[in-house]
């Protein structure tokens, strides 16, 4: 007999404003306990020092979390010049001191220009990437060093917000896998004085923006119904995908794992689309070569909407 899952079957997405000093996993577990949710997962780790947008998926939403993991992100960070730390941020130990040359806004902008577009980054040792099954940060804490291959990432936009004698503030929109700590270190190297970040805040992840976030402390002050009202529908994660409407007969075929003939609205073969029945989200389908659709990832609750 299968063991019954503990907790409440809740579906949806919570936009959490992660507090500083809390790991992403700890923040996830705090929220999961607060909602007494059966199943929950986050969609992209933030460093403990970092704050800001951490989308948390509950229940059926966890099926689609990869779409947010792969999404572009936007961050705001303060870059301190003249000091290099072993972690790339203010939580690490300073391992290099350099005098900071007299820099004006034009000097900084000239350096930033070399880091827009496709760039190569060597991931930091203090990261969750794994080597032989172990996170790199564990090896780093043991004083071990592992050679890491450079990875290609994309900085779509990088704006200089303000600058002072000892540092400057940036807003960066980038592809998945971009390490802002490494970006700051590389910019500091280009300026000839080294650098690390002293603050990092995520402002956007995929379709979600910071103005819709909720702090954990604010959620604690709400009753259960008000907390649940803060959850966004599952399909808000997928607004970048086209949508298709399906009739009851076709939806039943799809829910039984079969292909169905529907109006695919001219979508190309192998396209992924959101599927709806009477405005109720059923999941994702793939357009086949012959104009049919095949089930890709459907909600367990979709059968209720198709009846």
Swiss-Prot record:
<dbReference type="GO" id="GO:1990481">
    <property type="term" value="P:mRNA pseudouridine synthesis"/>
</dbReference>
<dbReference type="InterPro" id="IPR015240">
    <property type="entry name" value="tRNA_sdUridine_synth_fam1_C"/>
</dbReference>
<dbReference type="GO" id="GO:0003723">
    <property type="term" value="F:RNA binding"/>
</dbReference>
<dbReference type="InterPro" id="IPR015947">
    <property type="entry name" value="PUA-like_sf"/>
</dbReference>
<dbReference type="Pfam" id="PF16198">
    <property type="entry name" value="TruB_C_2"/>
</dbReference>
<dbReference type="Pfam" id="PF01509">
    <property type="entry name" value="TruB_N"/>
</dbReference>
<dbReference type="Pfam" id="PF09157">
    <property type="entry name" value="TruB-C_2"/>
</dbReference>
<dbReference type="InterPro" id="IPR002501">
    <property type="entry name" value="PsdUridine_synth_N"/>
</dbReference>
<protein>
    <recommendedName>
        <fullName>tRNA pseudouridine synthase B</fullName>
        <ecNumber>5.4.99.25</ecNumber>
    </recommendedName>
</protein>
<dbReference type="GO" id="GO:0031119">
    <property type="term" value="P:tRNA pseudouridine synthesis"/>
</dbReference>
<comment type="function">
    <text>Responsible for synthesis of pseudouridine from uracil-55 in the psi GC loop of transfer RNAs.</text>
</comment>
<comment type="similarity">
    <text>Belongs to the pseudouridine synthase TruB family. Type 1 subfamily.</text>
</comment>
<dbReference type="InterPro" id="IPR020103">
    <property type="entry name" value="PsdUridine_synth_cat_dom_sf"/>
</dbReference>
<keyword id="KW-0413">Isomerase</keyword>
<dbReference type="InterPro" id="IPR032819">
    <property type="entry name" value="TruB_C"/>
</dbReference>
<dbReference type="InterPro" id="IPR014780">
    <property type="entry name" value="tRNA_psdUridine_synth_TruB"/>
</dbReference>
<dbReference type="GO" id="GO:0160148">
    <property type="term" value="F:tRNA pseudouridine(55) synthase activity"/>
</dbReference>
<keyword id="KW-0819">tRNA processing</keyword>
<feature type="active site" description="Nucleophile">
    <location>
        <position position="47"/>
    </location>
</feature>
<dbReference type="InterPro" id="IPR036974">
    <property type="entry name" value="PUA_sf"/>
</dbReference>
